[in-house]
Regions:
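Allosteric cytosolic regulatory segments
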Residues: 179-186
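Signal-transmission linkers at sensory-effector interfaces
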Residues: 2-50, 55, 157, 188-215
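Signal-transducing coupling segments at domain and membrane junctions
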Residues: 94-95, 122-144, 164
Length: 217
């Protein structure tokens, strides 16, 4: 005789419920993070089409990245011949903009530019053999390092760095976001070169620095 007893064993319903709830929460968190990413990209896109100087836009972008990643520092370097020049930062004194330089052969930032690849180091980035010390930048002692190339027309024109003072395990989402932001900055620079007031012979660094300091009218 075949039994049709479908009664659930004691505790099995609770176990099933306990398994479903974490999955639902995980899915909800992923959806929220995706919405935050889309919001970030939208904010950057809107900033790119406003009547703002390049320095203002870049400063706005680094501030948005800092807010999204909860990092302590975000820096944008742009290529000037064989050097990378600091053109935007959420922390550096204004005098550091355009002054801090490193060769493409130097540092973790130079490696990212040369290799055209993302680089993530969760702790003790300053111990990496490729690391370059500046001496006058607080980021010299920061633990975690995340960096992505700035791409314009399939060419590296800069690098964007995210730094954490404490060790930080970078998520796949953070890596994707920084990669996309690097591409958005590249698009911004391409569009800037099309502006009627842009000097044809000027490179990206000259375009940014000649646009006036952030906050200028």
């Amino acid at each position: 005789m075949i039994s049709n007893d479908t009664r659930t064993a004691p505790g099995s319903a609770t176990r099933a419920h306990n398994g479903v709830v974490p999955k639902a929460k995980d899915l909800e968190q992923r959806l929220q993070r995706t919405e935050q990413q889309l919001r970030l990209f939208q904010q950057i896109s809107r900033m790119m089409v406003r009547e703002m100087s390049l320095q203002e836009v870049l400063r706005g972008i680094v501030n948005l990245v800092v807010e999204f990643t909860a990092c302590d520092s975000c820096l944008v370097y742009l290529v000037d011949n064989e050097e990378l020049v600091l053109c935007a930062s959420n922390t550096s004194h204004p005098s550091a903009i355009g002054r801090v330089r490193l060769r493409l052969s130097e540092g973790l930032t130079g490696w990212v530019a040369r290799e055209k690849r993302l680089l993530a180091i969760s702790r003790e980035a300053y111990k990496d053999a490729r690391f370059k010390f500046f001496g006058d930048l607080p980021e010299d002692t920061f633990e975690a390092f995340l960096s992505a190339p700035v791409i314009a027309r399939n060419r590296v024109v800069g690098v964007i760095n995210v730094r954490h003072k404490q060790p930080h395990q970078h998520t796949g989402g953070e890596m994707e976001v920084l990669t996309t932001v690097g591409e958005q900055v590249g698009c911004l620079l391409v569009v800037a070169r099309m502006h009627p007031t842009a000097v044809e012979s000027a490179n990206h660094v000259q375009l940014v620095l000649s646009s006036g300091p952030a906050g200028a009218p």
